[in-house]
Amino acid sequence: MTRRFLVAGQVQGVGFRWFVARHARGLGLSGFARNLPDGRVEVVATGGDDAALARLEELLRAGPAHARVEMVERHDEEDDPRVPTRSFEIR
């Protein structure tokens, strides 16, 4: 299963993508995090189990120290061959 998150708030320019990548890798997840032009961060994660994906969502809602997360949207999606399956990338 692939899970896509859209994170809104003060999440760009505060180390959010690096925070996500570090924790996702630690949870054994693959995928990517990238800034969107509208100020949100998109996080796409695959692999691991439901518990790992749920823990990642908790971490996204908390964010790093200098972030202010206002909203996290979650979408379960079919596996996408464009999503990395062996690493977690910062784009």
Task: Describe the function of each predicted region.
Residues 1-91:
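Intrinsically disordered, low-complexity, mixed-charge
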